[in-house]
Amino acid sequence: MRRTMFVVPAHLAPAVRSATVRDIHRQRAATTAQLGQALGWDERRCAEVETAVLAALTTHGAATAAQLAAEIPALREQMVTFPGKQYQSRQRVSSPILGLLAAEGRIRRTRPAGSWTSAQFRWAPARPLRAVPPAEAKTQLARRYLTAFGPATVADLKWWTGWSLTDTRGALAATGAQAVELDEGTGYLLPEGIEDIEDLGGRDGLQGAEGAGPAVALLPSLDPTPMGWRHRDWYLDPDHTKALFDRNGNIGPTIWWNGRIIGTWAQHPDGHLNHHLLTDPGGQARTAIEAETDRTRAFLADTRVTPCYRTPLERSLTT
């Protein structure tokens, strides 16, 4: 799924894995080729290191990447990623090896090594997941997606899952989703979603429904809501994209008002929350944003949070 980390309920993990198994096979081929080009490793060498990792985790129960590398010298070898690119860097072999084992469901990431904001995690052996037929898994995942993000277009679901166009259309059809007209074209909504709208009296009923008035939200970077659709114009001014996303398409912290993104926020090292509005939402919104900022600051208390993927605007608010 776009080689992005998703957190899902344990009972949904088998379907997620089966729905993306083709991509996992491609990831293994790509990782093996990358290690071969950078370090001269072949499939046999990769398998030996993977076996050593699994044996170490079985012995210890759980371990961080650094702990595994201290025990398995091969994991300390370094390779150049994206050679010749502006973002070229060096990384330990432990990163692609552990990532591949996790993608294949052979190990799982557990609790962080420190507080909940720590970027260092322990790894542990994973129990085998039950097999789900790929077509059934894709249908289940598409239904889950539409429940959370519908109505959505074919392009939205294809982008979110990383599936082919054929697989995306097939999964949508199997859900029984019904076509609805959206500003950006044809969208799809589950039958129960259409029934809910009809029960409220259609679009006019939605506008007047209890709790449907203007509301403010401060969402963290990479929150699944702004990353839920390929087409974003209905909740994000295209002119604001550059200020809110990094060059790889990762979104920073966002401020929402009345269902649209209107700015960003960041935590200063002293704990104070700064924000920047990209448009003037009016006095009511500014008052609500100040109140929500105070609430979020109180919630974070002494915790300091730094996004993994920084945007220039968010970074400027921390100085």
Predicted features, each with a name:
Residues 1-226, 230-232, 237-319:
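Long, low-complexity intrinsically disordered regions
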